[in-house]
């Protein structure tokens, strides 16, 4: 009765895939998740595209993680950092133990924020 399915936008077992090549962005994922959070309540079952069932707080934590990573990336991007610099800056270190390898997330987020194509 009180459930929402977020598909691949919410990955509860790793970092999300940002389809930056087709217009996806870290900002779009954050905005969609925030919009969903505003429409659910603490009793809502949140069904991610990958990983175990979650809830309101789990989705709120996911949004906070993405906003933190985005914020740290923008500081580096605004300072002229390359993707390689961002990959080596350790900005996801607090989350990597649970989320896994951040390489693809950082690559796609970098592209979505700068529109620079970088092979990696």
Which residues are covered by each model-predicted region?
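Metallo-beta-lactamase
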Residues: 1-68
């Amino acid at each position: 009765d009180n459930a929402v399915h977020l598909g691949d936008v919410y990955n509860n077992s790793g970092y999300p895939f940002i389809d930056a090549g087709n217009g996806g962005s870290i900002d779009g994922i954050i905005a969609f998740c925030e919009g969903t959070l505003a429409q659910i309540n603490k009793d809502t079952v949140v069904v991610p595209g990958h990983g175990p069932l979650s809830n309101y707080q789990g989705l709120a934590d996911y949004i906070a993680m993405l906003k933190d990573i985005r914020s740290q990336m923008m500081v580096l991007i605004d300072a002229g950092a390359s993707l390689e610099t961002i990959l080596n800056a350790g900005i996801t270190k607090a989350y990597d133990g649970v989320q896994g390898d951040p390489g693809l997330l950082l690559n796609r987020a970098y592209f979505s924020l700068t529109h620079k194509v970088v092979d990696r």
